[in-house]
C-alpha cells in the first residue's frame, strides 16, 4: 500500500462519527424471535451482528453499562452493583435515586468514553442517561437526562432529534431501558412479536437511524444490549431469614441474583458455616470474597473491597434471594421485590449473553461475529473516533477488528504499528537519558 493511500485511509477513519445506542433487555439467546423485524434485519443483511456478547459479573444494568462506557471491569471503575454500601464509611449508593449517587469524587472515579472524547475536543451528545446528573468535568456538550414526560428514543419525534444530533456531534449516545423494563414484567420466555411492544417501537425508531447511516459516508451505528434476563418463578424466591439466625447478620445489600452479607463483628465465619454447611439455601451459594480465601470463580473478578464485604450470596439462574427483616437490609425502607425476570447471574450463562449490532461505512457487510466482550466495544469506539487518552481497557482491538471493513482494518493496524514503534522508541530512550543524566 502506498503512503498516499495509507494517509487517505487514515483520514477516512478520522472523519467518522458514531451513534452508540444502549438498548437493555435484548437477550442473545432469544434474539432470533425478533431478528426478522425490519429495524434489526438490516444489520444481518448489511452490517454486523452477534448474539454472544459476554457481560461482566454481576450482570446488572448499571455495572455493565459503565463497563461498556469505560472499558474497564467493575472492580476498577467501582460500580459493583446497583445498590452499594461502603462498609467502611456507611455511605450508600441507591441506583441513581439519591442525590449522593451523583457525586463524582465518591462513585464516578473513572472517565467514561463521553468524557474522554470531550477532553479530546470531540463533540458529544447524550440522550436519556441518568449519569447526566453527575458533575462531570468537562461536561458533554449536550446531556439530556431521562424525560419527565416519559418520551424516549422509541418515540418518532425524539428519534428525529437524535438523528439531527448526528449531523453536529462526533459521538452520540442513547440510553434506552424500556425494553428491559417490559421484559422484566412479562419474562423473556413470553416475549415475542405480539407481546414485546417496546421492541416493536424501538426497531421502528432504529430505522430512522439506519436510513441516516445509509445516506452518509461519515456515520456509523452501534446497538448494544449488554446482557439478557432470566425468568424467576415465585416459588424460586428464597428468603435469607429462613436459613440463618438474623442476629448474626448486621445487614444485607441488594437482592435477586446477588446479595452481599455483612456479619456482626466476629461472626463472619459462623454465618458462612451456617449457609455453606449447616442450613444451605437451596440453589443459592455463599462465598468468601477475601483474597486468597475467596472461592468465587476467577472470571467474576469479584473481590473484597470497600463496597464488597467478606460474604456474598449468588443464586443459580432462575432463582433469587431476598431479606424479610427490613432492619437487616440496605436500603432499609425499600421492599425487596423480585420481578418476573431478572439479571445478575453468572456472566458465562447462555441466557445472560447480550446482543451487538453495527452498521456503517467502517463495518463489514453481512458479517456474523462470534463472541465478544463489552470492553471490546469500548476499544472499537476509541479506534473509530481516533480518541487519544482512552482508558487502559480489558478490551482488545485484535479480538474484534474482523468486524471492520478491509480499509478501516488496514488503517487501524497502521495506527497500532505506529503506536508500537513509538512505545519501543520511548522505552529505548529512557535508559539512554538516565545514562546521560548519571554521567
Spans of model-derived segments:
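Metal-dependent active-site segment of extracytoplasmic phospho-/sulfohydrolases and closely related
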Residues: 20, 39, 201-240, 381
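Short, structured active-site-proximal loop/turn typified by the sulfatase FGly-forming signature C/S-X-P-X-R
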Residues: 28-77
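Acidic/histidine-rich catalytic neighborhood
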Residues: 227-264
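Active-site neighborhoods of enzymes that stabilize oxyanions during catalysis
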Residues: 253-380, 388
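C-terminal GPI-anchoring signal of eukaryotic secretory precursors
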Residues: 408-429
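His/Asp/Glu-rich, glycine-adjacent segments
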Residues: 67-188
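Short, solvent-exposed turn/loop segments enriched in Gly/Ser/Thr/Pro and often Arg
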Residues: 51-69, 128-134, 393-401
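Cleavable N-terminal signal peptides of Sec/SRP-targeted secreted and luminal proteins
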Residues: 1-15, 427-438
Amino acid at each position: 500500500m502506498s503512503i498516499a493511500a495509507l494517509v487517505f485511509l487514515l483520514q477516512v477513519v478520522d472523519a467518522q462519527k458514531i451513534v452508540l445506542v444502549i438498548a437493555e433487555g435484548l437477550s442473545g439467546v432469544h434474539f432470533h424471535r425478533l431478528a426478522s423485524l425490519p429495524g434489526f434485519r438490516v444489520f444481518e443483511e448489511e452490517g454486523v451482528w452477534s448474539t454472544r456478547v459476554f457481560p461482566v459479573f454481576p450482570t446488572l444494568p448499571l455495572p455493565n453499562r459503565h463497563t461498556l462506557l469505560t472499558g474497564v471491569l467493575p472492580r476498577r471503575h467501582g460500580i459493583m452493583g446497583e445498590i452499594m454500601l461502603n462498609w467502611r464509611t456507611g455511605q450508600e449508593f441507591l441506583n441513581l435515586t439519591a442525590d449522593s449517587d451523583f457525586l463524582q469524587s465518591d462513585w464516578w472515579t473513572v472517565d467514561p468514553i463521553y468524557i474522554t472524547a470531550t477532553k479530546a475536543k470531540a463533540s458529544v451528545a447524550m440522550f436519556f442517561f441518568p449519569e447526566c446528573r453527575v458533575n462531570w468535568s468537562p461536561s458533554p456538550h449536550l446531556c439530556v437526562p431521562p424525560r419527565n414526560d416519559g418520551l424516549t428514543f422509541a418515540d418518532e419525534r425524539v428519534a428525529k432529534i437524535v438523528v439531527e444530533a448526528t449531523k453536529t456531534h462526533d459521538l452520540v449516545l442513547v440510553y434506552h431501558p424500556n425494553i428491559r423494563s417490559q421484559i422484566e414484567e412479562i419474562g423473556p420466555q413470553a416475549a415475542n412479536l405480539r407481546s414485546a411492544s417496546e421492541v416493536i417501537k424501538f426497531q421502528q425508531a432504529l430505522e430512522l437511524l439506519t436510513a441516516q447511516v445509509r445516506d452518509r459516508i461519515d456515520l456509523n451505528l452501534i446497538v448494544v444490549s449488554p446482557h439478557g434476563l432470566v425468568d424467576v418463578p415465585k416459588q424460586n424466591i428464597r428468603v435469607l431469614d429462613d436459613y440463618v439466625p438474623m442476629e448474626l447478620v448486621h445487614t444485607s445489600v441488594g437482592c435477586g441474583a446477588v446479595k452481599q452479607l455483612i456479619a456482626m463483628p466476629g461472626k463472619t465465619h459462623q454465618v458462612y458455616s451456617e449457609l455453606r454447611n449447616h442450613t444451605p439455601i437451596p440453589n443459592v451459594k455463599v462465598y468468601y470474597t477475601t483474597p486468597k480465601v475467596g472461592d468465587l470463580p476467577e472470571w467474576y473478578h469479584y473481590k473484597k473491597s470497600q463496597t464488597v464485604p467478606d460474604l456474598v450470596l449468588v443464586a443459580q439462574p432462575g432463582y433469587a434471594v431476598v431479606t424479610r427483616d427490613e432492619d437487616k437490609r440496605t436500603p432499609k425502607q425499600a421492599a425487596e421485590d423480585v420481578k418476573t425476570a431478572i439479571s445478575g447471574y453468572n456472566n458465562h450463562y447462555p441466557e445472560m449473553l447480550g446482543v451487538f449490532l453495527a452498521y456503517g461505512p467502517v463495518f463489514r457487510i453481512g458479517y456474523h461475529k462470534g463472541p465478544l466482550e463489552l470492553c471490546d466495544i469500548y476499544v472499537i469506539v476509541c479506534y473509530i473516533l481516533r480518541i487519544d487518552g482512552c482508558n487502559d481497557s480489558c478490551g482488545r482491538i485484535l479480538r474484534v477488528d474482523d468486524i471492520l471493513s478491509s480499509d478501516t482494518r488496514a488503517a487501524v493496524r497502521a495506527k497500532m504499528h505506529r503506536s508500537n514503534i513509538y512505545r519501543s522508541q520511548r522505552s529505548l530512550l529512557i535508559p539512554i537519558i538516565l545514562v546521560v543524566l548519571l554521567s
